[in-house]
From Swiss-Prot:
InterPro entries in alphabetical order: Ald_DH/histidinol_DH (IPR016161), Ald_DH_C (IPR016163), Ald_DH_N (IPR016162), Aldehyde_DH_dom (IPR015590), G-glutamylP_reductase_CS (IPR020593), Glu-5-SA_DH (IPR012134), GPR_dom (IPR000965)
Protein name as it appears in the record: Gamma-glutamyl phosphate reductase
A GO MF term: NADP binding
Organism: Moorella thermoacetica (strain ATCC 39073 / JCM 9320)
Main location: cytoplasm
Subcellular localization: Cytoplasm
Length: 418
């Protein structure tokens, strides 16, 4: 099957499946999710074998440590994916929820009810877990999904899609509800970007290059999941022990993800007392530090930070550090270089915290906590399909509610308009 025919055929199947999914009951959708979870565990050996092929190819291509980490599947990650599907099954079904109802003077009753978006296209890079998370969320919310993963995870995505789609269909979901574009040909992406006849929305997940390509070239509506150039600002009135714990977690707990911190801003009043011990702890964890001139005066072994560093999402054990002279300077830096993803302040001053919350324009703004919590699971949404950095139609971690739209339902008793 050539690429154009594959996109057309799977698009038609998805459109047909979406009509059935929209009316599929909650219990039937949950049964399918639980069947998918069981299938992942039962087919673990085949999934890991497919992933091993991708890992070998990735190492031969010289993929970075961060990319290889995102690509890797192991028993724990498969268990986590299965657990995520079970958690999703336990969540309330947003579809059919009447969010408001009112009566007009003429007696008309008007309600606003949640409904699926329809067919969702997901274009993503080397993260096989996205295959399962996206499929599960779309099924939960009555949406059909067409997946197009990165070539680095080709075999993993094939194996995962085969396992979960068969399980979902056997449990009562329509055929075509979960489909993967099974080619590494980049033309498939170009075709999906213009597949208005089949797709209701496209969601890209990946690096800046992929997201920019989708946003600039798609004729299908796009929900932009942005790059995470995230900051932590350590205020003059911060608890420095707390600040060190937060910084180390935000940078090193999992550096290859979009909610990891990339730049640390430190108020000049605490820089001399805070940075030496922090730098030693970061060095012990293998972090490369790139600092401004004032940072390097305190941490002599730090590399020189350039203008490019302030704007870079490293996705690696690299941290840029800048000493600032005020909250205003920190806010200005975040405004200039931030990507409206996740930003944090560490402070004991309530008014300073309130000002930071009010003035930082980001999907998630933290006081005294790590940026690593910007995540659908951590927010209690179950799985997430991505973290939106735009303001329409969704913002922040996109859980089930964010994969619905609404329609109005109107009950009358013979009213006609005069």
């Amino acid at each position: 099957m050539n690429v154009a025919l594959e996109v057309q055929t799977k698009g038609q199947r998805a459109r047909e499946a979406a009509r059935i999914l929209a009316g599929l009951g909650t219990s039937k959708k949950n049964e399918a999710l639980l069947a998918m979870a069981r299938a992942l565990e039962e087919e673990q050996e085949a999934i890991l074998a497919a992933n091993a092929r991708d890992m070998v190819a990735g190492k031969e291509k010289g993929l970075s440590r961060a990319l290889l980490d995102r690509l890797l599947l192991n028993e724990k990650r498969i268990r986590d994916m299965a657990a995520g599907l079970r958690e999703l099954a336990a969540l309330p079904d947003p579809v059919g929820e009447v969010t408001s109802m009112w009566t007009r003077p003429n007696g008309l009753q008007i309600g606003r009810v949640r409904v699926p978006l329809g067919v969702i296209g997901i274009i993503y890079e080397a993260r096989p877990n996205v295959t399962v998370d996206a499929a599960g969320l779309c099924l939960k919310t009555g949406n059909a999904v067409i997946l197009r993963g990165g070539s680095e995870a080709f075999y993993s995505n094939q194996a995962l899609t085969r396992v979960i789609s068969r399980a979902a269909t056997a449990a009562g979901a329509p055929e075509g509800a979960i489909q993967l574009i099974e080619t590494t040909d980049r033309e498939a992406v170009n075709l999906l970007l213009r597949a208005n006849d089949y797709l209701d929305v496209l969601i890209p997940r990946g690096g800046a290059g992929l997201i920019r390509t989708v946003v600039e070239n798609a004729t299908v509506p796009v929900i932009e999941t942005g790059v995470g150039n995230c900051h932590v600002y350590v205020d003059a009135e911060a608890d420095l022990d707390m600040a060190q714990r937060i910084v180390i977690n935000a940078k090193t707990q999992r550096p290859g993800v979009c909610n990891a911190m990339e730049t640390l801003l430190v108020h000049e009043k605490v820089a001399d007392s805070f940075l030496p011990s922090l730098a030693a702890a970061l060095k012990e964890k293998g972090v490369t530090i790139r600092g401004c001139e004032r940072t390097r005066a305190i941490i002599p072994w730090a590399e020189v930070a350039t203008e490019t560093d302030w704007a870079t999402e490293y996705l690696d054990l690299i941290l840029a550090i800048r000493v600032v002279d005020s909250l205003e300077s920190a806010l200005e830096h975040i405004h200039r270089y931030g990507t409206k993803h996740s930003e944090a302040i560490v402070t004991t001053n309530y008014q300073t915290a309130r000002e930071f919350l009010a003035r930082v324009d980001a999907a998630a703004v933290y006081v005294n906590a790590s940026t690593r919590f910007t995540d659908g699971y951590e927010f209690g949404f179950g799985a997430e399909i991505g973290i939106s950095t735009q303001k329409l139609h969704a913002r922040g971690p996109m859980g089930p509610e964010q994969l619905t739209t609404f329609k109005y339902i109107i009950f009358g008793s013979g009213q006609i308009r005069q």
